[in-house]
């Protein structure tokens, strides 16, 4: 009835009486309904919709302003005519706008970092080839990584179809160098990669110089001779047991004093055979872990950089790796002087407009510095969590045990070489203990997480899981999912073979 009385339209016959009743102010009723169901609008909008004059509609809206409190003003950033808006609509819009603004400025939960870092660092990305491997090394400069996981788990997860020859080529071209950062037992150690051009500003001084007789002699010979093969060093140091000299070289490697022009010695680390007593064999070949040319790391720090240059280079490197740099991240990196030492440089970068300072991640301290674009990426991960990702527990992109605390698990998790984490939806779902025998769960891992876990077999050759959360894997809640992911029964649990040796589960 209101359409008939206000607009003069003919109604179809047969309508119920309730639908044809008019009102005292039919145009006002139509405008009131329009205002309640629309965002701010100019008078021309309902006039155009109903084929009425703007003057008549404007008069009706002004009557509603007096009777219903309809609001008139500039509500939209269009620069056009002023608009009309129902007060309830405006209150609703303000509530939604405030909620959106709060979500834009509120810190993300700390767990979001676990999904953000792999995406930020390009894990499982599309990088390929020599030049993009060099980019990856640039992002990893100074990160301390176990030698046993460096290529298999860290470089291999960032560069598709990674081959060791790629790193060898970059080293032989003088583009990349590696430096030892401490032993891990008798068959492994921590190393850091650097771009050769950045080494003078990033390679740290060794904490202490080793003072054993062989260490001192090696240091003198390398300083005098420059880069040298093992046989030349062995002869210059007076001969003797080649294994003793090799051990002394590696002592100096892990102390950050000596490096090599190849990554091959790193690949040949592992448990050493027991020495036998008796006559020493004649040395015809250098011990495998002594191949390549050895040189002093001190040469990489030339030309010498000033302390300020070193701090600026380190700050830029850490920001590039983490995107959002926090006190906890700096602590996990083992930076001398900690966050306080970098703070003046970070403040200067903020004042220059190169970084933003704010409280971006909940629970990680009030002073956080972020690169442009990193905060938007961080919030995008919060709003749309990524799929399943497999990481070495020691990967710089693995936040757990560094910036993010471990969730409650049925066993002890640690950033140990040979252990793996599986993230799903940006949250930790699986922790595979070193050696692969024990699996710990957080929440309910889905098929995508178990499929990611199965790829460990391709890296290590064979993955045999014996327990889940301390209980036998056979008969556990994960048994069916593991079978679906390709695992089959073994005498001790469930097994999956990697690569060409992969076996389908029984009954598949």
Describe the role of every protein-language-model region:
Residues 1-508:
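Long, charged, low-complexity, helical-prone intrinsically disordered regions
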């Amino acid at each position: 009835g209101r359409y008939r009385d206000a607009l003069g339209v003919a109604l179809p016959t047969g309508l119920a009486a309730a639908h044809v009743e008019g009102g005292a102010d039919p145009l006002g009723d139509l405008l009131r309904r329009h205002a309640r169901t629309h965002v701010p609008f100019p008078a021309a909008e309902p006039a155009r919709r109903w084929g009425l004059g703007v003057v008549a509609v404007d008069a009706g809206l002004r009557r509603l302003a007096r009777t219903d409190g309809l609001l008139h003003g500039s509500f939209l950033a269009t620069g056009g005519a002023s608009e009309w808006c129902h007060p309830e609509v405006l209150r609703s819009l303000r509530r939604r706008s405030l909620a959106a603004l709060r979500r834009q400025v509120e810190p993300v939960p700390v767990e979001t970092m676990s999904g953000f870092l792999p995406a930020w660092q390009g894990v499982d990305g599309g990088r390929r080839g020599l030049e993009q491997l060099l980019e990856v090394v640039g992002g990893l400069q100074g990160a301390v990584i176990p030698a046993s996981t460096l290529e298999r788990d860290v470089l291999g997860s960032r560069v598709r179809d990674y081959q060791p020859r790629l790193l060898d080529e970059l080293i032989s071209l003088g583009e990349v160098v590696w430096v030892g950062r401490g032993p891990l037992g008798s068959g492994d150690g921590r190393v850091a990669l650097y771009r050769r051009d950045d080494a003078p500003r990033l390679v740290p001084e060794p904490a202490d110089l080793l003072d054993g007789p062989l260490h001192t002699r090696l240091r003198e010979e390398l300083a005098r001779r420059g880069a040298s093969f093992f046989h030349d060093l062995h002869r210059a140091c007076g001969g003797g047991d080649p294994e003793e000299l090799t051990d002394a070289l590696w002592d100096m490697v892990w102390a950050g004093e000596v490096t090599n022009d190849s990554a091959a010695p790193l690949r040949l680390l592992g448990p050493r055979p027991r020495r036998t007593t008796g006559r020493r064999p004649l040395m015809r070949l250098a011990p495998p872990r002594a191949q390549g040319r050895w040189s002093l790391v001190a040469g990489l720090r030339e030309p010498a950089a000033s302390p300020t240059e070193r701090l600026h280079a380190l700050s830029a490197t850490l920001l590039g790796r983490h995107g959002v740099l926090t006190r906890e991240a700096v602590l996990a990196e083992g930076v001398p002087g900690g966050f306080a030492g970098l703070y003046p440089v970070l403040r200067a970068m903020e004042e220059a407009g190169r970084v933003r300072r704010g409280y971006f991640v909940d629970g990680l301290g009030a002073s956080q510095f972020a690169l442009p674009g990193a905060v938007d990426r961080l919030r995008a991960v919060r709003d749309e969590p990524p799929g399943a990702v497999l990481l070495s527990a020691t990967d710089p992109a693995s936040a757990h045990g560094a910036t993010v605390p471990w969730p409650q698990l049925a066993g002890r998790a640690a950033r140990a070489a040979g252990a793996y984490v599986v993230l799903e939806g940006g949250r930790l779902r699986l922790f595979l203990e070193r050696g692969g025998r024990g699996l710990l769960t957080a929440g309910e891992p889905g098929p995508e997480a178990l499929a990611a876990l199965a790829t460990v077999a391709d890296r290590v050759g064979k993955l045999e899981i014996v327990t889940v959360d301390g209980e036998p894997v056979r008969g556990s809640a994960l048994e069916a999912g593991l079978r679906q992911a390709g695992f089959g029964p073994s005498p001790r649990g469930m097994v999956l073979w990697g690569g060409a040796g992969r076996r389908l589960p029984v009954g598949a």
